[in-house]
From Swiss-Prot:
The keyword Membrane does not apply. Residues 1-56 form the HTH deoR-type domain. One of its GO terms (molecular function) is ligand-modulated transcription factor activity. Keywords: DNA-binding, Transcription, Transcription regulation. Gene3D superfamilies: 3.40.50.1360, Winged helix-like DNA-binding domain superfamily/Winged helix DNA-binding domain. Residues 18-37 bind DNA. This is Uncharacterized HTH-type transcriptional regulator YciT. The keyword Glycoprotein does not apply. PROSITE patterns: HTH_DEOR_1 (PS00894), HTH_DEOR_2 (PS51000). GO terms for cellular component: cytosol. InterPro entries: Carb_Metab_HTH_regulators, DeoR-like_C, DeoR_HTH, NagB/RpiA_transferase-like, Tscrpt_reg_HTH_DeoR_CS, WH-like_DNA-bd_sf, WH_DNA-bd_sf. One of its GO terms (biological process) is DNA damage response.
Amino acid sequence: MNSRQQTILQMVIDQGQVSVTDLAKATGVSEVTIRQDLNTLEKLSYLRRAHGFAVSLDSDDVETRMMSNYTLKRELAEFAASLVQPGETIFIENGSSNALLARTLGEQKKNVTIITVSSYIAHLLKDAPCEVILLGGVYQKKSESMVGPLTRQCIQQVHFSKAFIGIDGWQPETGFTGRDMMRTDVVNAVLEKECEAIVLTDSSKFGAVHSYSIGPVERFNRVITDSKIRASDLMHLEHSKLTIHVVDI
């Protein structure tokens, strides 16, 4: 994917639907070129075409979400990877930032064992030198993730020193929250383990709130996010006695 196609995809993700005319104006190329780019992106399952428009895919699609704010998430992933030591066994939960963390660890050829509930992450690491343990459960097709009672049982049987977890929202009154009940249940099972729990998320999630609680906040050790986080949110997080890593973007 070239830089123009990344720009197109970002616009479509941000707006949900963008006309071919607007994409041509924004990128400075002809509508013919835009249609060629859209054909390419549709074949890669990043978006879908409608008459005269490009339309975003379902927000549960991991690959599409990973391309949203890609550069920012890549910076977060590289910082998170620096916390992982050679020979360590870690848990990486589902989600776009976590998928980039897994990819980064694979590219760095670190001798680590990665336990995950994400079949997407497992496939991403198929050629990487690290060992991958994919836990079983009920398969959520859109998120490409395992959930349910069997997944909870699997989590009880494995051990890891760090867990990297994604969130969908955070507010001072609610703490960390998720929008999927089954996924949230899996995360809470992870938090019952004796491990260092690390939130890996871009700053857009702060200020949002969803139906299902992840936590309590006191169970987490660190938060890795970007420098666009609001000062008030940062202050509240620090008052929760979390170690906050703010990556400059």
